[in-house]
Every structure is written in structure tokens, then in C-alpha cells.
């Protein structure tokens, strides 16, 4: 399972959003997944995204993962980024109970308002399980809320990388089980190839593309 580069070296392309309160570890989760490193990061200002290519279920995937700011003043900025997302990861901090209750009070409502895809796959992720002694939300509570919201569920630690890859891989597998989302992922690749064709024609008069 490795990253690969190449403009059309993948079979499917999916857009995934990371949402949740500021400080729950969304950026750390993303950095841990992308680069296998763990860093203490400053809060994201606005929206950032990163791309990861990997193979899941025998398919080469390009995941464009959007990391949205959790601060209240940036919330309106994120509304357009829900458009076209095939997967949404709702992140909370298992040591901060308010980040868990906000999944319903704030983020669940935001998804209802802004998500344009009814079949979009959602996953509830409890981060910072490496701080078990400080836990304020039990695993059982997380599972119960995930059932209530019709979400997948996983606990992880961006710091130790426990379950980080599993989080994104399980979400991608679930997305591929939904025919309409699978079609969207395939169409995105075709659009990308068509977009690039004129570039190849002008830049290389006689050559072959890999």
C-alpha cells in the first residue's frame, strides 16, 4: 500500500471532508495519514486539502481530503466545500465531551444543511485514544451516537497512528459499495483525463503519455 504519483494513475477519485470542533485533531489525523508523521499543528485557517493515492480493495484511489476549520467564525466558509463530497469524517476528541455533543448540535445540522449528496458515507471518529486516562466519552457512547446518526464508527490516535489508515481505508471501501458514489468517483477520473489531453497535445508534439 503506497502512495503513487501520476496524473491519471488511479481508477477512482473521491472527495472526503474532515469536520469537527477546533482542536480535535483533524489536521493531525490528516498529516498522520498522508506522511506517517505526527506533529503538533497550529489550527487550520479556513480550509486546507491534501491528496493521497493508495490501493484499497484492488482499486487505485485518489483521495482529496479537505480539512475544514472548526472555529465558529470560519463556519460559513466551509459550506461550499460540502458540495460533491462522497465521504465525511466527523471528528471529536474523546477527552473533551463538548466536542462530542457538538457532533449533533452543530456538525450534524451543518451536514443536513449543506451536503448535496444524500448517499454520502459518514464516519464518526473519536481521536486521542492515546490519552485514555483523560477520556470523557466512552467507546460505547460513540458507537451509540454513530448508530443514531447512521454513521460508521472508529476510535483512533493521530499521535500514535493507531487506526489512522484503517479510518480512511474503511471509509473508501464503504464508498465503493454505493453504486452512485462509485460512478461519481469514476466520472471524476474521466473528467481529469479529458482536461489533461489538450496539455499533452501542446506540450509534446510526438510522444506517448504514461
Swiss-Prot record:
Pfam families: Ras
GO cellular component: peroxisome; plasma membrane
Topology in the lipid bilayer: Lipid-anchor
Membrane recorded as keyword: yes
Residues bound to GTP: 20-27, 67-71, 127-130, 157-158
Chain residues carrying a lipid of type S-geranylgeranyl cysteine: 208-209
Keywords noted in UniProt: Cell membrane, Cytoplasm, GTP-binding, Lipoprotein, Membrane, Nucleotide-binding, Prenylation, Protein transport, Transport
SUPFAM superfamilies from the UniProt entry: P-loop containing nucleoside triphosphate hydrolases (SSF52540)
Motif (Effector region) on chain: 41-49
Keyword GTP-binding found: yes
GO biological process entries: protein transport
A GO molecular function held by the record: GTPase activity
Cellular compartment(s): Cell membrane; Cytoplasm
Family: Belongs to the small GTPase superfamily. Rab family.
Job description of the protein: Intracellular vesicle trafficking and protein transport.
Oligomeric form and interacting partners: Interacts with XI-2/MYA2.
Name this protein carries in UniProt: Ras-related protein RABC2a
Gene it is expressed from: RABC2A
